From Swiss-Prot:
Name of the molecule in the record: Uncharacterized protein B407L
UniProt biased composition (Basic and acidic residues): 192-209
Compositionally skewed regions (Low complexity) per UniProt: 116-126
UniProt induction comment: Expressed in the late phase of the viral replicative cycle.
Keyword Repeat attributed: yes
Sequence repeat ranges per the UniProt record: 112-116, 117-121, 122-126, 127-131, 132-136, 137-141, 142-146
UniProt KW keywords: Late protein, Repeat
Chain intervals for the UniProt region annotation (Disordered): 116-209
Location of the region described as 7 X 5 AA tandem repeats of G-[NS]-[IV]-R-[DS] in the Swiss-Prot/TrEMBL record: 112-146
UniProt lineage: Viruses, Varidnaviria, Bamfordvirae, Nucleocytoviricota, Pokkesviricetes
Family label: Belongs to the asfivirus B407L family.
Superkingdom field: Viruses
């Protein structure tokens, strides 16, 4: 049989070093007690249940290994062989055929004809029946009728009320329990199920992880002060890294001329929660501006495309309509500037699960579409201004108005 014990006390290694000795008896040896607890073996509850069940059966005089409790045992009251001179004598002073014969039901003890109180202690002497009979008063009607005992509903109903335990009923219950055990979970499966349910992996809180690290450190070094020093150094390094991230975000926002005066900058002495809150606020402010810029560039690029396709010279098929979208990007710029928060939210929901490479492509993609249009507008404005200056109008006010109109037209 496989060993099902496990060492639960091994998880308490080093626990005595964490205990406060102020309220502990000075004569107590904590190290010795720890060794005793760690070396103690603990069994499964199923084994403890089996031990209690066997002890209870022993106190009641029940032996589960007795053939009497098997389904194949003969239908007799006493299954043990009689000890004595002959086979007619029975164990304990009762003859085998004197109690359960053909005239009396073999499935019960004296059903109907012998009551539970008819045979009393002391009525059978010397372990045998004198003169082959039982004295009067011990059995009602003076004797047991052979081959003439009536078997009917009345006798059977009276046997149910007898205080004597019917072995046929016991065999029936035992057979039902045997059948139910075949469909039940085996003992090994119950133990495995118990182990998996009790010791399944659960979510570990940070405080639990810290306790585990402390116990592992005590097992290796045994000095709790050095562990706390390492924990303090680790927390300090984490704060320095996060403070550097805050400085980088402040630099980015300063280059974009975004104010951060309302945010209190933490120091190395600030708590970790305060530092995390500042990082979250600066990150939201930074990505909000970036995401709104991405949305503006994409929508303005689409407006530029409509201006190129529908400039008033092309006709839409089947509609006989020539739309002119020249200068649409200026209208888009004004509208999008008022909706920077909404556009940043839309882009933020789209890019939150994107990889860094995809974000870079999304940032540079609209610029590839807008750059040719910007260069073309710049060259056209320079050419118009150069031609106007070469013309040299006589009236300076007329020249100024023409230059102003040319620049205004090219900026559309």
């Amino acid at each position: 049989m496989e060993d099902t014990t496990f060492l639960e006390g091994a998880n308490l290694a080093g626990i005595t070093t964490l205990m406060n000795n102020l309220h502990i008896n000075e004569q107590a040896n904590l190290e010795e007690l720890e060794k005793q607890v760690m070396g103690k073996q603990q069994s499964f509850p199923t084994d403890h249940f089996d031990e209690e069940l066997n002890g209870l059966a022993k106190s009641l005089g029940i032996n589960f290994n007795d053939p009497e409790f098997s389904l194949d045992a003969a239908h007799s009251v006493i299954s043990k062989k009689p000890s004595g001179r002959g086979s007619d004598k029975v164990h304990g002073g009762i003859r085998r055929d004197s109690v359960c014969t053909d005239s009396i039901c073999s499935d019960s003890v004296c059903s109907g004809s012998i009551r539970s109180g008819s045979i009393r202690s002391g009525s059978i002497r010397d372990g045998s029946i004198r003169d082959g009979s039982i004295r009067s008063g011990n059995i009602r009607d003076g004797s047991v009728r052979s081959s003439k005992t009536r078997r009917g509903p009345a006798r059977n109903s009276s046997s149910r009320n007898d205080r004597g335990y019917s072995l046929s009923t016991h065999r029936k219950k035992y057979a039902e329990s045997e059948a139910s055990q075949k469909t039940a979970i085996s003992k090994r499966d119950r133990k495995n199920h118990y182990a998996e349910s009790e010791y399944s992996e659960k979510s570990i809180k940070p405080s639990t992880k810290q306790v585990d690290r402390l116990i592992n450190h005590l097992r290796s070094n045994g000095d709790p002060n050095s562990f706390y020093k390492k924990e303090h150094d680790y927390e300090r390094k984490t704060k320095l890294v996060k403070l550097e991230k805050i400085n980088m975000l402040l630099t980015y926002l300063g280059n974009e001329q975004i104010s951060t005066d309302d945010i209190k900058i933490p120091t190395i002495d600030s708590s970790m929660q305060e530092i995390d809150d500042v990082i979250e606020m600066l990150t939201l402010r930074n990505v909000g501006i970036r995401y709104s810029s991405i949305a503006e560039e994409i929508l303005i690029g689409l407006a530029r495309g409509l201006e190129i396709v529908f400039d008033g010279t092309r006709e839409i098929p089947f509609l006989n309509y020539r739309p002119d979208y020249t200068g649409l990007h200026n209208t888009f710029m004004i509208k999008l500037f008022k909706m920077r928060y909404e556009t940043s939210q839309v882009v933020g929901n789209l890019v939150q699960n994107m990889s860094p490479l995809s974000k870079i492509c999304l940032e540079l993609g609209p610029s590839l579409l807008l750059y040719p249009a910007l260069i073309r507008t710049k060259h056209k404005a320079s050419e118009d201004l150069y031609n106007l200056l070469q013309k040299g109008p006589e009236d300076p006010f007329t020249a100024y108005n023409e230059i102003h109109e040319t620049l205004k037209k090219n900026n559309k």
